[in-house]
Amino acid sequence: MTNEINSATVTQDEVIKWSREAQSTLEKTQKICTDAQSSMQKTAQELTILIPDKLQAIEFLFKSYREQYDSILKQIETTKIYLHTNIDKVFNDIKDLLDPSLARLNNILLELKKTRVPSIVVEGTSEGKTLFDFTSIQSINLLKENIGIFKSNCSKIKNLLDLEVKEKLNIEQDRMNSRWNKSVKMYDLIAPLQLELRALIHGASNESNSFMGTILRENQALENELVSILEMQTNHFDQCMKAVELISSGNGCDMNLGVLKNDAQELPEVFKELTTIYDIILRNEERSKKFLATHMPNIEKISDIVKEELAVFRKFKTEEIPRYTFLIAECENKLKECSMPVKSDQSPSQVYTQTLQELTEHYVKFINIYKTKYLAELHHQQFTYPRKFLKKLTEFLNEDIYRIQIEESERRRQWTSRYGEFIPSEFKLPGEHELPVIVQIITEGLEYIQKEDGQEEEPNIGNEKELMDMITGSNK
């Protein structure tokens, strides 16, 4: 009964119209579905392939950047430590050891210049002589000249290393630190994106509340709806074609044309729903593009900075570090050059310092012995003992003469043995061979205490007074 009503109320033209509308709508639906599928694939590729690949690449680059940054900083610090330990020590030794020792020697030489040597001390000399005139001044000047050359070379080397190594290392270190801090700040900007991607990778997209997860989840649901609508419209088109065939053959009663009519009437609404879904898919694609436009510049900028820094690092490690190393080695060899023999465990500063200290010690002893020992001994030998000898002689060659000669000879020998090395050879010091002796009852060595007529000279006048004044002045 129903089929008869349907067949009677639905004409062949209506069914043909439905089929044409179904075909047209299906064709448009297929095109929209194709475009929608392309849009979703593009969005999925951007969110699941492009961004992950970019992030993976920048993570690899940044890891390499961090390793190279740490490595070069360590090299710079190692170079600075080496300079401080092996090079700066040379300059510190000059300041702490060599310069003070040189100053002490100059002070003692100045004291030698102030210490007068009377004519009685050295025969055939004029007044105005000082102890300084009896030093190895040429050797001392040569030593000081060599020390001056050494210090001048060290100063030039220090300026060279400060300018060409230390300053440039500090500049490079500051530049590296500045670029590193800038890169870290930029890298931190993509940290949320990295976390979002990790959450997306380790969890299903339909469970992620992140932007990318939401987009992918929405597109998956929309894709399912598109498939459902496409299947429904395809089925409706098939039913329409079947209805046309049945009605044309007079078998229209075999179909429920009422349902087909309702489907045909709902077709515009279904297509509208399809276009709405497609609009959402396009909006998701646009959102994805904006998302990329927000993050990709940072990723690209970080990538460019890191690549640029890695290139700078490579050049620094292959060109600058070897150049610094070679320059330091050359300077270190120059700093070891010395005009005197140097042991393996000594530096030129230590050798020069030791020599200066030995000279200073020698001349300190020289002055002290001259003032406290030599002048008194000279007075004894030229005035005190001759008077004693003459006194004994006047006692008609008392047997004590022989004894005091022996005593005096031994005393002079001991004195010469103890202090003689500090007395210049030009200085007058009779010694054992000028002991007063009796030669045919003619006295010798008493000229300082006797007048030409053989009478005793008045004490504390002439040479003796000068000598006594110097002894007295030395003891003050």
Curated annotation (Swiss-Prot):
It is found in: Cytoplasm; Preautophagosomal structure membrane. GO terms for molecular function: molecular adaptor activity; protein kinase activator activity. It comes from the Eukaryota. Pfam families: ATG17_like. Keywords: Autophagy, Cytoplasm, Membrane. It is a peripheral membrane protein. GO terms for cellular component: Atg1/ULK1 kinase complex; phagophore assembly site; phagophore assembly site membrane. One of its GO terms (biological process) is piecemeal microautophagy of the nucleus. Signal peptide: none annotated. InterPro entries: Atg17, ATG17-like_dom. Belongs to the ATG17 family. Autophagy-specific protein that functions in response to autophagy-inducing signals as a scaffold to recruit other ATG proteins to organize pre-autophagosomal structure (PAS) formation. Modulates the timing and magnitude of the autophagy response, such as the size of the sequestering vesicles. Plays particularly a role in pexophagy and nucleophagy. This is Autophagy-related protein 17. It comes from Candida albicans (strain SC5314 / ATCC MYA-2876) (Yeast). The gene is ATG17.
